[in-house]
């Protein structure tokens, strides 16, 4: 579901931006500090209620303002949505969808599935397991409406269990938490396992397209020993958990691992190859969403030319075209985009930014 219009007020150095957007490729060009990344960040914020760069609102609001405002129109074949989000320095958020208050960020996220490809996004591969769990859970959030409530309740119960650990004297005092925790852990793990297995061939196929020289293999690890009953694991690990102050094993420790030639990819691949692999993962997941749910996914790509040679850039552009998705790409100059042959497509749009303002 593409954005047809985007208005940004007082978001970082973007004080007043009004864009009529293409449903295909939108290129944002400008020198460092012009606001290119901030524009992508604003779109991301509109779809997630948070930034991919900072969790501190005061760093995002323009220094002369008390709040920032984001507004967009979202077009689908038979529907149109109007979305507005405002955040002030106290951290209060006002969200409206089609003029209605009381909406949740989850409602907005369901409306705007998006994938982000940035230089910092390599943490998906060389960061901790939490980044890869988030990758899986993004897909499940958009595939299964019930997943969000399972996941949120699981997090709540784990937090309560961890808080109770230093206060209880015996395991029997934790059983009330663990009965429900085990149920939710099995539900979340079953959904993650099935989704990971369904996504695996799509990822491996896309990896062969970008990295034919390296066989990439993916595997899901549930967070405790395969075949073991999680209820027994919790009971047997009570003293250990109590000593360290948190629940050591479970779905909160799950991982989705990537290997090349039998070794972790972060130990084998160059930065350029890691970036290609990250692109392949994001593309495969976005394409899988289109196939399974008939829903388009937005792609936000920052610093497009970084660490990719011209041939790989053209390959990425070609695959993005094939998805039929709306794409936002930043680059320092239009020349960096020439490898994509974007001039051939009449619906594409090019925007020039300078010091937070659109150049006309």
Swiss-Prot record:
Among the GO biological process terms of this entry, one is:
SOS response
Pfam assignment, any one = SMC_N
Q: Which residues cross the membrane?
A: none
- UniProtKB keywords: ATP-binding, Cytoplasm, DNA damage, DNA repair, DNA replication, DNA-binding, Nucleotide-binding, SOS response
Name the GO cellular-component terms: cytoplasm
Q: Which GO terms describe its molecular function?
A: ATP binding; single-stranded DNA binding
Chain positions recorded as ATP binding sites? 30-37
Which InterPro entries does the UniProt record give?
DNA-binding_RecF, DNA-binding_RecF_CS, P-loop_NTPase, RecF/RecN/SMC_N, RecF_2
Q: Where is the signal peptide?
A: none
Keyword hit for Cytoplasm:
yes
Chief place of localization: cytoplasm
SUPFAM superfamilies, from UniProt?
A: P-loop containing nucleoside triphosphate hydrolases (SSF52540)
- Where does the protein end up? Cytoplasm
Record has DNA-binding as a keyword: yes
UniProt lists the family membership as follows: Belongs to the RecF family.
Do you know which PANTHER family this protein is assigned to?
DNA REPLICATION AND REPAIR PROTEIN RECF
* Protein role: The RecF protein is involved in DNA metabolism; it is required for DNA replication and normal SOS inducibility. RecF binds preferentially to single-stranded, linear DNA. It also seems to bind ATP.
Name of the molecule in the record = DNA replication and repair protein RecF
> Where does this protein come from, organism-wise?
Haemophilus ducreyi (strain 35000HP / ATCC 700724)
Q: What is the lineage of its organism?
A: Bacteria, Pseudomonadati, Pseudomonadota, Gammaproteobacteria, Pasteurellales
């Amino acid at each position: 579901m593409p954005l047809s219009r985007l208005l940004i007020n007082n978001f970082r150095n973007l004080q007043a931006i009004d864009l009529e957007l293409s449903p295909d490729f939108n290129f944002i060009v400008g020198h460092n500090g012009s606001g290119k990344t901030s524009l992508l960040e604003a779109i991301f914020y509109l779809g997630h209620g948070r930034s991919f760069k900072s969790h501190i609102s005061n760093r995002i609001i323009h220094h002369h303002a008390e709040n920032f405002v984001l507004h967009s129109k979202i077009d689908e074949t038979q529907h149109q949505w109007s979305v507005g989000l405002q955040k002030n320095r106290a951290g209060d958020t006002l969200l409206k969808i089609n003029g209605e208050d009381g909406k949740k960020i989850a409602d907005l996220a369901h409306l705007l599935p998006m994938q982000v490809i940035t230089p910092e996004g390599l943490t998906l591969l060389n960061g901790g397991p939490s980044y890869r769990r988030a990758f899986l859970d993004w897909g499940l959030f958009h595939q299964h409406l019930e997943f969000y409530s399972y996941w949120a309740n699981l997090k709540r119960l784990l937090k309560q269990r961890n808080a109770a650990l230093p206060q209880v004297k015996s395991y029997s005092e934790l059983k009330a938490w663990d009965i429900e925790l085990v149920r939710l852990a099995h539900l979340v793990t079953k959904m993650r396992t099935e989704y990971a297995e369904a996504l695996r061939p799509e990822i491996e196929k896309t990896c062969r397209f970008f990295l034919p020289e390296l066989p990439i293999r993916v595997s899901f690890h549930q967070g405790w020993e395969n075949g073991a009953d999680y209820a027994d694991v919790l009971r047997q690990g009570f003293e250990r958990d109590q000593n360290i102050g948190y629940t050591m094993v479970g779905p909160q420790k799950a991982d989705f691992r990537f290997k090349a030639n039998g070794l972790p990819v972060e130990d084998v691949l160059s930065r350029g190859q890691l970036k290609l692999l990250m692109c392949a993962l994001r593309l495969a997941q976005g394409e899988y969403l289109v196939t399974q749910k008939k829903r388009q996914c937005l792609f936000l790509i920052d610093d497009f030319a970084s660490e990719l040679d011209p041939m790989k850039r053209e390959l990425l552009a070609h695959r993005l075209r094939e998805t039929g998705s709306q794409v936002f790409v930043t680059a320092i100059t239009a020349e960096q985009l020439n490898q994509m042959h974007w001039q051939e497509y009449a619906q594409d749009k090019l925007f020039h930014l300078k010091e937070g303002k659109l150049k006309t």
